[in-house]
Amino acid sequence: MISRRHFLQASIASSFIFNSLGINNSSKVMAQQNISEKNLLDFKSFGNVSIMHITDIHGQLKPLYFREPDINLGVGNVLGKPPHITGKEFLKYFNIPVKSADAYSLSSEGFSSLAKTYGKMGGLDRIATVVKSIRSERPNALLLDGGDTWQGSYTALKTNGMDMVKAFNLLEVNAMTSHWEFTLGIERVMELVDNHLNFPFLGANIFDTEWDERAFEPYTFTEQNGKKIAIIGQAFPYMPIANPSWMFPGLSFGIREKNIQEIVNEVKSKNADLVVLLSHNGFDVDRQLATRTEGIDIIFCGHTHDALPIPIIENKTLLVASGSNGKFLSRIDLNVDKGIKDFKYRLIPIFSDVISSDKEMANLINEERKPFLSILKEEIGETDSVLYRRGNFNGTWDDLICNAIIDERGADIALSPGFRWGPSLIPGSKITIEDIYNATAMSYPKVYLTEMTGNTLKIILEDVADNLFNPDPYYQQGGDMVRVGGMGYKIDINKSQGNRISEMTMLKTGDRIEPEKKYKVGGWASVNENTEGPPVWELVEKYIRRKKIIQIEKNNSVKVITG
């Protein structure tokens, strides 16, 4: 494990903003604490290469609230290592004062109250301001997109990703990789890549199954201050497992460790001074990959939505985690001379009330949203609870979705996927149609209703649990744990596959779920092609309209054994 001293030495020039921050209830708290655009962007240029990174935007054009996880368990070699520490432990580990701006942006501690103080984060118009500011002093600074960009909002759904393509073209991104992009269907992906995207769509690990040839560009070269930079793209390796393979027939993915090493060797043979892996593997996969390959200087991580204030170092490789939903933009300046000699890093928090809106990007966003604005802004209810998704187990957004499935479809048990995307709502917020789509907008949304035996339910839970808690990161193949409604269970994350789940119980009666008994189960986002049922957003809208006020009780239905 890297020591805290090693962390601090590795990013000696890394710039946090919390040093002068306290907290009070004043509406002028930002000004009082000297949190200004100038303060947030203050960064003395360093070295000869500058790179910016954003990832997992999930279609979010506008500022939002996003609560970080309060539980993000690690197993095996990553137990107790970042990013598998949360809340107070996270703040203590990185020496971040409680109630500070950094505590709000990077942890779940006091989220609801701090959100009222520090406000929303993100917004591509604010990100555009940051990008332009950095490029004003470093004109050739690279901007890399880690993927999960074209999906996750109403406008992305209705435009089939075109709104995000336009926005990222305007940002002048230099390269991207992918995951959820392929749920638009391979034909749409190719249409956007071939006819609309102004920068490389990289996927060194995506192969044509018929010819066993690469289906996309594996890497691209660029130059900055005389230094040749190789950017290798690594798409999400488990697409056919986690998402519907019928949407992208003829393609295979995978980690392809040997393939990556061969490409690294290839770009080095072509005189690359710096080798960058733009990855959507997930942080733990990237950490292991760094220990099993040689010659990768930086991995820009994606998929798991982790936000870390400083890079992690594994086997001389820097791992950068830039969060999700537009909350952060990473900037790293490097002194490059046949590899990294030194670096300076900052995870820039995009506080929407502080960073000014870029007019050009704001105009584009307004134009993309204009045809749908009356729908997006329609208020259908209000929440008394914080609605969030991110975390290993049930979040309140998914509790709401499960409740809607049970009530509207007459199910005994509801299953909701362990997706990490979707903004949060703070207590007292109106719930709009846009909010529902932000938590559900995807291309296979149908809510099925079927019968499953207790045995089948256990197999499903065991399978997902192994995808999350297998001690070998290369077998961690999905999102967070499937969310459940109407039932509870106990999970021992350290046991082997098939032995983690026990004490499955019907919450309404307290009865144990019987292996051979059939139960009426509703769920959504099935990867099966012929799934029948209404779209999930339709059920959730009906449920909220009927309830009017949403109040989610604390969910204690999942008992987690970690020791």
Residue ranges and their predicted role:
Residues Y345-S356, M506-G510, S526:
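Short, solvent-exposed aromatic-acidic interface loops
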Residues K316, D384-R389, M442-Y444:
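Flexible glycine/proline-enriched surface loops and loop-helix/loop-strand junctions
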Residues M1-I2:
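Secretory targeting signals
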Residues L8-I12, F18, M30-S352, E360-M361, ...:
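Acidic, metal/ion-coordinating pockets
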Residues N19-S26:
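C-terminal segment of classical bacterial N-terminal signal peptides
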